[in-house]
């Protein structure tokens, strides 16, 4: 009986360790991905005034 209980605890322990490792790995990767998305958003936000200016220039040329 004791050996069966020990085997059960060891098995659950391995799954718990694996689950914890995968959980923290996924959280870390998601954090990296979020940082990349924030950088992309910043770059696009910086480009927006230039795009707006170009669109206004095109509108002016079309209205002439």
Swiss-Prot record:
Keyword Phosphoprotein annotated: no
Domain of life of the native organism: Bacteria
Annotated keywords: Antibiotic, Antimicrobial, Bacteriocin, Plasmid, Signal
Residues in the signal sequence: 1-16
Biological-process GO terms, alphabetical: defense response to bacterium; killing of cells of another organism
KW Signal (keyword) present: yes
Regulation: induction: By UV irradiation.
InterPro entries given in the database record: Phage_BhlA/UviB
Protein role: May have a role in bacteriocin secretion or immunity.
Protein name, per record: Bacteriocin UviB
Encoding gene (name): uviB
